[in-house]
C-alpha cells in the first residue's frame, strides 16, 4: 500500500517482528468442540449467500461440530451491535463475532479487554505475508492482533440503471459533484420518480453512509481525516460547505421513502425508477442475488468527487474472551483467513478478499475493478463502518443524522454541532 493510504503508527517491519516474536493466548488445538456459534448481521441477500458459502466449507471441515448461525438482521450491524453488547455484558459471548477493522475492533472491543490476542494464530497461519501490513495494523493494539479480516468493501460507489440514464440523456458517469447535480436535474426533467435514491430506515445508518461519502467528496481526503486527528473542525467552513452538498442531495430524494432500508430503497435502481444511489459494493451482490444483471440492470462508477479515492471498510472475525467453544472458533478463524475461505465468501458477498493472493478469475467485472482500484487508489477509511470511528461515535452520528432528517434537513449548523459533540465525547 502507499504512503498516506491508511494512517499508521508503526511500519510493516514492526508488525512482522511482533508476529514472529510474540506469543499469545490463541494457541492451536484440535477442534473437539461439539458446537460453534457465529454472530453477524448477514441475514439476507448476497451477505447471507457469502456467509453460507463459508459455513458450508466449515461444516465440511468440522463435521462433528454443530453450526449455530446467530445472525441479527439490520444494515451496518445497527441492531446486531446492540444485541452483542447486551450478551457480552451478561457473560454470554458468542464463539466469534463480526466487527469492522479499525477503531470499531480496536477501541470498542480490544481496548475494553473483550477479545483474545490472535498474534500466535497469525504466526502459525503465515498471515503476515497474506494480509497487507497496513490492514493488519487496523486490527492491532499495543503490538497484539485482535481480529481476522475476511474482506474489503468499497463504500464510495455510485450506482445507476443504464437504460434509465440513457432515457434522461446521461451518457457517461459524473466525475464531479457539479456533474452529478447536473445529471440529477436531467433525471428530474425526464420524470424519474426518485432522482437520488435515499434509505433513511434501519437507524439512519445509510444516510450517515451518504454523509460520510459527501464529506470526503467535498473536503478531500486530508481534510476529512483531519476531522479525527483534530486538524479539521466539525464546525468549520469545510464541513459547512459539505453539509450544503449533503442538503442539496437530499432534496432530490423521495421523501415518502425515507423510512426504507437500503435494500428496499436500492431496488429502485434495478427496477428503473431511481436515478443515482450512493451505497457500498454489497449492493451489487444483493442485486445479483435478486436476479439483476451487472451492466444491464445496473452499473457503477466511483462516487463523484472521489475518483481515485477508495473509501474502504473491512469485515473481520474475532475470538471473544470467554468463548465457550474456543477450539471451534479457532477453526472458524483459520478458515476465514484462508485463501480457500475468502475466495468462496467474497464473490458472493460482493467484496474483494483481504488477502493479497486471491484468485481474481472467480470475481465479476465490478470486483475485478475494485481490486485494481484498491491496489492504486488513495485509501480513506470509512467512518460509518468503523475504520475511523468506534461504536459510540457511529451511534451518535446515526442519531445526529436521523435528527437532522426528521427536522426537514434544514439545520446544518445543528448537525455540525451534534457531530462535534459526538467526537468530543469519544476523545475525552
Model-inferred region functions:
Residues 351-354, 370-424:
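C-terminal capping/gating helix-and-loop segments adjacent to ligand/active sites or protein-protein/ligand interfaces
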Amino acid at each position: 500500500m502507499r504512503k498516506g493510504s491508511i494512517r499508521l503508527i508503526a511500519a510493516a517491519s514492526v508488525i512482522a517482528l511482533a508476529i514472529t516474536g510474540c506469543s499469545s493466548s490463541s494457541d492451536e488445538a484440535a477442534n473437539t468442540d461439539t458446537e460453534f456459534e457465529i454472530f453477524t448481521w448477514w441475514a439476507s441477500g448476497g451477505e447471507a449467500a457469502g456467509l453460507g458459502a463459508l459455513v458450508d466449507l466449515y461444516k465440511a471441515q468440522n463435521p462433528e461440530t454443530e453450526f449455530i448461525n446467530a445472525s441479527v438482521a439490520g444494515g451496518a450491524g445497527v441492531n446486531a451491535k446492540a444485541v452483542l453488547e447486551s450478551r457480552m455484558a451478561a457473560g454470554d459471548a458468542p464463539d466469534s463475532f463480526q466487527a469492522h477493522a479499525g477503531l470499531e475492533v480496536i477501541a470498542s472491543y480490544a481496548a475494553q479487554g473483550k477479545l483474545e490476542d490472535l498474534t500466535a494464530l497469525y504466526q502459525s497461519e503465515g498471515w503476515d505475508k497474506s494480509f497487507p501490513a497496513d490492514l493488519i495494523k487496523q486490527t492491532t493494539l499495543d503490538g497484539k492482533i485482535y481480529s481476522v479480516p475476511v474482506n474489503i468493501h468499497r463504500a464510495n460507489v455510485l450506482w445507476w440503471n443504464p437504460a434509465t440514464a440513457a432515457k434522461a440523456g446521461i451518457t457517461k458517469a459524473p466525475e464531479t459533484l457539479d456533474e452529478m447535480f447536473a445529471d440529477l436535474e436531467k433525471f428530474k426533467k425526464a420524470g424519474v420518480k426518485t432522482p437520488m435514491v435515499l434509505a433513511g430506515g434501519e437507524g439512519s445508518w445509510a444516510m450517515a453512509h451518504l454523509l460520510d461519502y459527501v464529506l470526503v467528496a467535498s473536503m478531500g481526503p486530508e481534510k476529512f481525516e483531519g476531522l479525527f486527528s483534530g486538524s479539521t473542525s466539525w464546525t468549520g467552513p469545510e464541513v459547512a460547505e459539505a453539509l450544503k452538498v449533503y442538503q442539496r442531495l437530499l432534496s432530490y430524494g423521495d421523501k415518502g421513502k425515507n423510512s426504507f432500508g437500503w435494500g428496499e430503497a436500492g431496488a429502485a435502481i434495478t427496477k428503473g425508477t431511481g436515478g443515482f444511489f450512493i451505497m457500498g459494493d454489497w449492493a451489487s451482490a444483493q442485486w445479483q442475488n435478486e436476479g439483476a444483471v451487472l451492466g444491464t440492470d445496473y452499473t457503477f462508477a466511483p462516487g463523484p468527487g472521489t475518483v481515485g479515492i477508495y473509501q474502504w471498510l473491512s469485515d473481520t472475525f474475532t475470538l471473544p474472551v470467554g468463548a465457550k467453544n474456543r477450539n471451534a472458533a479457532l477453526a472458524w478463524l483459520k478458515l476465514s483467513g484462508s485463501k480457500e475461505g475468502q475466495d468462496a465468501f467474497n464473490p458472493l458477498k460482493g467484496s474483494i478478499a483481504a488477502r493479497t493472493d486471491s484468485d481474481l478469475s472467480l470475481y465479476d467485472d465490478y470486483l475485478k475493478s475494485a481490486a485494481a482500484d484498491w491496489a492504486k487508489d488513495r485509501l480513506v477509511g470509512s467512518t460509518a463502518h468503523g475504520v475511523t470511528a468506534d461504536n459510540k461515535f457511529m451511534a451518535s452520528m446515526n442519531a445526529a443524522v436521523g435528527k437532522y432528517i426528521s427536522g426537514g434537513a434544514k439545520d446544518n449548523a445543528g448537525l455540525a454541532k451534534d457531530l462535534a459533540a459526538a467526537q468530543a465525547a469519544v476523545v475525552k
